[in-house]
Amino acid sequence: MPANRSAIRIRDAESVRVVTLDRPERRNALTPAALDALEAAVSGTDRPVVYLRGAGPAFCAGADLDVVADLDGPAAEEFAERGQRVANAIEDAESAVVAGIDGPARGGGVELALAADLRVATPEATFAEPGVKLGLFGAWGGTVRLPRVVGEGEALDLALSGRTVDADSALRMGLVSRVTEDPRAVADELADNDAETLRAVKARMRDDAPAEVQERRETEVFGRLVERHADAIADRRDS
């Protein structure tokens, strides 16, 4: 990669931060430095929506195997922890995060997409967890999120076989939210909604507190939003 080009590119529109994995010659494989830059890009914005995409014909090949090949055990653990921090940053971001997946998503690329709020694929997208073929597995939170998203049976099938699934199969198993020619349009669709409400919905959906605590928080936030939008609600009622 040329020294003057970052592996992560940021472009801020009015309501959407576009974060591009920008290493197309390596199918956007991620080094430790790129992971750190990605974490900062996703966390360091007040835009209500973050759109995560890959440059070139792939979404993301996951971890850079040139890096992994040189790691000893402790360094490999640190690299896995780094990837987990990035996935957690995506999941915990105040912004709604949309992963636009065009072309192959492999290994860590799938794991980062799993942390997004919406995974939107083009018809050309494909997905695989091929680590098992190298004697590895997805350690950027994949063993936690994959069964949560698609169910234990589908998750075990993908992770134990390393097989590749196309966009339609990914949609059927719930791995992606939609299949469309223009995933960016979905990010823009979300950004048309009220920013505070987007943050509130994400926070409530991601809340893992006991049910009674979640319900109390839900009512408190709902009350605040009703007060804030009272005029708009009245106008809609009277129209």
Regions found by a protein language model. Name each.
Residues 2, 8, 91-195:
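Crotonase-fold acyl-CoA enzyme core
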Residues 2-13, 162, 166-167, 172, ...:
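C-terminal alpha-helix plus adjacent terminal tail
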Residues 52, 65, 76, 83, ...:
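A general structural signal for well-ordered alpha-helical segments in protein cores
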Residues 1-55:
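Conserved CoA-thioester-binding segment of acyl-CoA-metabolizing enzymes
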Residues 54-89, 105:
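Glycine- (often His-adjacent) and acidic-residue-rich active-site loop
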Residues 37-44, 89, 185-190:
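CheY-like receiver
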